[in-house]
């Protein structure tokens, strides 16, 4: 049965016990918005609300933006699509503080990381570090992919539990979406049974930055535990990230969550140091010398690679070109990281047959168009 640690200080924490469960691939990490720091230092929710200008009294697309984070759109389809595109742009920004935390987290030997967020900042970080991973996400009321690769610490599963921004129809943005999502979870429609078995077989869950104060989180925890006696009884380690003692008592008693007085940034740093002392951090791959030796290509030559269906090679050449022009190229480097991540995710979805064949060329062409635009901008760097 999964175990947890009782409330203690970070200096007294039994890191060896956590490391043992990590090494045994029996420790699952759950991430929420509290792990993030948005550009400018705001919380993720505050920054996203500003980005979407939700305070407008006559917002053209959003009729109501609730405190629980759910939207009511003026037009359910067209306005939802517009706001989804804005949210995608928001997460495509550079998140330097969050990326720094994730760079430490990516080197920890978790075999499964479950995110309640829809973004791909963590997988972008894995890409930047050259670390292996497998991405997947929950798509409510859709059949899960037939293929399932067992997660491993050298190739962890990064699983977006409430949809992925690259698949807009999978996102949970409205109350209606959420109740559809709960129905899908209740009927066990869209999560691969082998993944559920992996979650049931864990010895420890670690919760970081989850929305304990939101009304729907309690409901989500209950529904997630309905199909397994093991999941109902799982004990969890979580950080004491809120001040309401009644709420803490509720989670401690109802959900067997034991709280640890810390915050995500400190906890990740402390666990990183403990893993470093124990010699279990993942080793970062050495830079590919072939990439450094790639010649600079002109914009016309890069576009010719794209025209010849050599998109991946064009991305590699553009990366080498931009790397040689830092710091002037930093903003374009970040844009290319986002684009490369989107390309890799699209390839993964194609291989796993989780994308409609009609959508594949459309999304590929969108990536190519953005790549061509980056090439044009890079040409100005000389």
Where are these regions (language model features)?
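Gly/serine-rich nucleotide phosphate-binding loop at the start of the catalytic core
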Residues: 1-106, 111-114, 119-122, 132, ...
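Active-site gating loop/helix substructures
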Residues: 133-200
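Hydrophobic/aromatic side-chain positions at a characteristic register within alpha-helices
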Residues: 306-307
């Amino acid at each position: 049965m999964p175990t947890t640690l009782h409330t203690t200080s970070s200096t007294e924490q039994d890191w060896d016990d956590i490391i043992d469960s990590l090494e045994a691939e029996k420790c699952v990490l759950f991430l929420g918005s509290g792990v993030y720091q948005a550009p400018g230092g705001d919380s993720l929710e505050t920054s996203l609300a500003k980005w979407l200008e939700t305070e407008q009294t006559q917002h053209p697309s959003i009729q109501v933006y609730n405190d629980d984070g759910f939207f009511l759109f003026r037009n359910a389809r067209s306005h939802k699509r517009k706001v989804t595109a804005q949210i995608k742009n928001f997460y495509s920004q550079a998140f330097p503080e969050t990326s720094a935390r994730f760079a430490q987290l990516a080197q920890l030997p978790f075999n499964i990381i479950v995110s309640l967020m829809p973004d791909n900042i963590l997988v972008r970080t894995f890409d930047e570090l050259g670390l292996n991973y497998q991405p997947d996400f929950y798509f409510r009321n859709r059949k899960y992919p037939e293929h399932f690769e067992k997660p491993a610490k050298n190739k962890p599963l990064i699983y977006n539990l409430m949809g992925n921004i690259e698949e807009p129809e999978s996102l949970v943005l409205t109350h209606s979406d959420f109740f559809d999502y709960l129905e899908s979870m209740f009927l066990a429609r869209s999560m691969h049974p082998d993944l559920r078995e992996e979650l049931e077989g864990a010895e420890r869950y670690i919760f970081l930055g989850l929305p304990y104060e939101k009304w729907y989180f309690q409901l989500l925890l209950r529904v997630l535990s309905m199909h397994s006696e093991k999941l109902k009884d799982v004990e969890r380690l979580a950080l004491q990230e809120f001040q309401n003692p009644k709420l803490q008592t509720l989670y401690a008693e109802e959900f067997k969550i034991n709280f640890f007085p810390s915050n995500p940034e400190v906890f990740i740093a402390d666990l990183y140091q403990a893993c470093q002392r124990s010699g279990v951090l993942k080793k970062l791959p050495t830079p590919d010398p072939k990439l450094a030796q790639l010649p600079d290509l002109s914009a016309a030559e890069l576009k010719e690679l794209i025209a010849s269906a050599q998109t991946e090679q064009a991305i590699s050449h553009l990366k080498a070109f931009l790397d040689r022009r830092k710091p002037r190229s930093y903003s374009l480097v970040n844009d290319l990281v986002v684009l490369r991540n989107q390309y890799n995710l699209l390839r993964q979805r194609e291989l796993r047959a989780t994308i409609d064949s009609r959508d594949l060329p459309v999304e590929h062409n969108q990536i190519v168009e953005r790549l061509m635009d980056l090439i044009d901008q890079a040409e100005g760097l000389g």
